[in-house]
Amino acid sequence: MELGLSLGDAVTVADGGRLELVLGLGVGVGAGVRRGEEEERGRREDVVGAGRWAAMAAASPEPSVRLSLVSSLGLHWPSETGRSEAAARGFDVNRAPSVAAGAPGMEDDEEGPGAAPALSSSPNDSGGSFPLDLSGHGLRGHAEAAAQGGGGGGGGERSSSRASDDDEGASARKKLRLSKEQSAFLEESFKEHSTLNPKQKVALAKQLNLRPRQVEVWFQNRRARTKLKQTEVDCEYLKRCCETLTEENRRLHKELAELRALKTARPFYMHLPATTLSMCPSCERVASNPATASTSAPAAATSPAAAPTAAARTAVASPEPHRPSSFAALFAAPLGFPLTAAQPRPPPPASNCL
């Protein structure tokens, strides 16, 4: 089954009886070509194509399907020579012209209109064409596929080697599994000294049936865990201290605000001036009596001592007087009232002051 796709050109049949798949794109170029002429030519090409298709169907025993798409859109622009000419470009996928020959054809087509018909790849082309070598692309595609296959084999080898390296690295980085006895012994050793010198490391590795590097890595991890735990404890302590200080600061700010409010507000009490206490006369006498008694007591204590000396001095100085007779003394004594006892003095009235 053969498929023919035609856009503006007729389908051609090769000498071997096979159907050529021709992709033709007819674009009318020219300012003076009218749309009616383009449509008339399209109808003629359709009639010619239908006739050739019927002849091919009668000659070929195999069924075939034909798809014809005729473009009725004409884009016109003036050429370099100033005249209008119709140019149709076709792609012949069954022929194998060289790409190098097609490129000069394009250059000649641009340079002058006379060289274009000579390089036309199809008898139905009127303006010029450029062939496309798909067979070369196919060969090149096969070569690239082969190269990719070879490169894929090399890439597969490289990927396999990389996978083996990754497996080795993973086995080397595999986590160390220790028994309970080994873990307990390492913990006791870590409590005694957290760092090991080379001799201690080798001795501990021999004792636990491990490599020195494994012992060193275990101690490094243990120190890291210890440091991390200590850091967490310190962070918690600092967090609590910060919370306590925050509460204290809030409380102090509150007290300061209250004191400032009391200072700026008007006071509710009045300052009373200092007063003098008055005393009644009786209280003054009572208060003054102890003072006079205390001042007179030393004077009384000193006066008896001085009295004998004065009496002795007067006794020595004055001679003893002549005593009269008792009879003369009796009549010479003056008469007076009889002696009576002294009346006591009434006490002063009590005062009413407190």
Swiss-Prot record:
One of its GO terms (cellular component) is nucleus. SMART domains: HALZ, HOX. PROSITE patterns: HOMEOBOX_1 (PS00027), HOMEOBOX_2 (PS50071). GO terms for molecular function: DNA-binding transcription factor activity, RNA polymerase II-specific; sequence-specific DNA binding. Residues 98-175, 294-323 are annotated as: Disordered. Residues 171-230 bind DNA. Expressed in seedlings, roots, stems, leaf sheaths and blades and panicles. Residues 229-273 are annotated as: Leucine-zipper. The keyword DNA-binding applies. Keywords: DNA-binding, Homeobox, Nucleus, Transcription, Transcription regulation. Transmembrane segments: none annotated. Residues 148-157 have a biased composition (Gly residues). Signal peptide: none annotated. InterPro entries: HD, HD-ZIP_Homeobox_LZ_Class_II, Homeobox_CS, Homeodomain-like_sf, Leu_zip_homeo. It is found in: Nucleus. Its main location: nucleus. Probable transcription factor. Belongs to the HD-ZIP homeobox family. Class II subfamily. This is Homeobox-leucine zipper protein HOX27. It comes from Oryza sativa subsp. indica (Rice). The lineage of its organism: Eukaryota, Viridiplantae, Streptophyta, Embryophyta, Tracheophyta.
